[in-house]
Amino acid sequence: MSSPLEKPQIIAHVQKPVTYTLFDCKWIPCSAKFVCVGNLARGSGVLQVYEIQQGEAKLLQEAEKPKPIKCGTFGASSLQQRYLATGDFGGNLNIWNLEAPDTPVYSAKGHNEIINCIDGVGGVGIGEGAPEIVTGSRDGTVKVWDPRQKDTPVANMEPAAGETKRDCWTVAFGHAYNEQERLVCAGYDNGDIKLFDLRNMSVRWETNIKNGVCSLEFDRKDIVMNKLVATSLEGKFHVFDMRTQHPSKGFASMSEKAHKSTIWQVRHLPQNRDVFMTSGGAGNLHLWKYEYPAQRSRKDSDDVDMGVAGSVSLLQNVTLSTQPISSMDWSPDKKGLCVCTSFDQTVRVLIVTKLNKL
């Protein structure tokens, strides 16, 4: 990639101003539509569905909800139904049919406080086993839900009695490569990262990255754990090689100081797991490529396998706004198409070029 013209370019295709605070956006699988959720000025929540038509974003659906909606996922829904699961400021977990979004098809009082983050697995053709949703909240708990089971979570990871409750900011499923195996990774405001094994209900690994963990994502949910990216408050992100776990040192990792402000989100390209985008608090997006080391593991002095971290290279960066880009989502179907939202009350559809050349 010698000349600038050979590098991927990040092009703003559509910019759509809205009249509310945007918190999350998701592409609707197998469509040219996306959904946005957020907070109206009068304190209620809003859910909107847009479709890309002739270079414009056309509003198809809008529904107002009692509580502001913080996060959403299609990860536990079938490709036929494409139901959106959301978490709101009241601690409620709801699942919506976007064709008729007036009343939820599933509802549970999930948490005592705001649901900050949500993820799903077992739906949209990703991950083996039953569909499940995970939610993380300010109340310090991480809960796993089966949308076929009402009211009670199938797993509840909460601090032990006497432990301080930390604000859970981000959750991610991974390792769902067969019907038995499944992991949840959770990140907290004090820099803790915890990896929960749902098969034997234990903490498989934990670490601390010294700054609040804003976003976590495995490069793929439906394979044996490969890589995990964690982003943090001080403009730094960490990439953990999850293939080799050392008994005392854990997983090998590398870190990169990229943005000069909080890195709000990381999203891996669905069509290439070694390419990912980070979104920053100064309104910028950075596109990265992970390079594996020559050998991913080596023996330590006691002849025990330990991982070797790789490196990242910056492919492209662009500043879209003066406000934080709070969420972004790649299209699962069209390589290089993505949608992002910012606190400048604008949703943007972007096209990233030349990704097939990487």
From Swiss-Prot:
One of its GO terms (cellular component) is dynein axonemal particle. Pfam families: WD40. Disulfide bonds: none annotated. WD repeats lie at residues 64-106, 116-155, 163-206, 208-250, 258-298, 320-358. InterPro entries: WD40/YVTN_repeat-like_dom_sf, WD40_repeat_dom_sf, WD40_rpt. Keywords: Apoptosis, Cytoplasm, Repeat, WD repeat. It is found in: Dynein axonemal particle. Coiled coil: none annotated. Its main location: other. GO terms for biological process: apoptotic process; axonemal dynein complex assembly. PANTHER family: MRNA EXPORT FACTOR AND BUB3. Interacts with PIH1D1; the interaction associates DNAAF10 with the R2TP complex. Interacts with several dynein axonemal assembly factors. Key assembly factor specifically required for the stability of axonemal dynein heavy chains in cytoplasm. This is Dynein axonemal assembly factor 10. It comes from Xenopus tropicalis (Western clawed frog). The lineage of its organism: Eukaryota, Metazoa, Chordata, Craniata, Vertebrata. The gene is dnaaf10.
